A protein has these predicted regions:
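Short S/T/G/P-rich N-terminal loop/turn motif that feeds into the first structured element of a domain
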Residues: 1-44, 48-53, 62-66, 88-99
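A generic structural motif
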Residues: 55-57
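An amphipathic, aromatic/His-enriched active-site/gating alpha helix that lines ligand/cofactor pockets
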Residues: 60-92
């Protein structure tokens, strides 16, 4: 199942200015595939809105708890507040509309 994770942080916790957070991002990036796999998840895509201090990650996983556990193990909870949304593709949504 697909989950869109929305991650927000304050400007003072931004990897662009906080060296400790930047180091965490570099470690997370290097270990992401392995950590996600340990929770039965895979990375499907990611987007960053630098000025809004928002990150969006699309994760395929067995359930929201696995996605949340992976986010914690990746260290994302250290500087972000996360919201996890179950999502489907637009084609799936349109295909599910009543005739």
């Amino acid at each position: 199942m697909l989950y869109m994770m929305s991650l927000s942080h304050s400007p003072d916790k931004c990897p662009g200015v906080a060296i400790e957070i930047r180091d965490r991002v570099m470690r997370m990036n290097a270990t992401m595939t392995e950590v996600l796999k340990s929770h039965g998840c895979t990375f499907q895509g990611g987007w960053v809105s630098k000025g809004a201090h928002l990150t969006f990650m699309l994760i395929d996983g067995p359930n929201a708890h696995a996605v949340d556990d992976a986010a914690v193990d990746l260290g994302l909870a250290v500087w972000n507040t996360s919201t996890i949304y179950p999502v489907i593709t637009m084609d799936e949504a349109v295909g599910g509309l009543p005739s």
